[in-house]
Amino acid sequence: MKIYKIPSDLRAFIFDIDSTLYTNQAYAFEQVDCQVRQFAKERGISADEARRMVAEYRKQFAAEHNGSKVSLGNTLLSFGVPIEQSVQWRRELLEPADFLRRDEKLIDELKILQKKYQLICVTNNPVLPARKTLDALGIS
């Protein structure tokens, strides 16, 4: 994490939820892979073939854009999957409680911060899986 400047009158902390507020490699992988598997299912191809397609597209994109990374949403869009569809897949397929557990240390630390600061969570996931994530961690 980089901290550029902390104002003297700090009133709030804004946390990204996934892989910042908590880390879980298996769930981070699942957030991507569940969409890739759904793409494979709808295309009638294997999950491994879909993973290969995604990896190849991302590699080609990086080569053509000075090493820049492309999101999974935009990768799927290049294969004809509207962003709205990939968002819907995340709503339907993500189950954070399968990977995350109540985190007492996180709860205690956030309680300390909450005494003095407003706490805000953000994510690029849809609201439903975000709320399920906070519930699983015990901080909703």
Spans of features found by a protein language model:
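Substrate-recognition/cap helix-loop segment adjacent to the acidic, metal-dependent catalytic center
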Residues: 107-120, 124-140
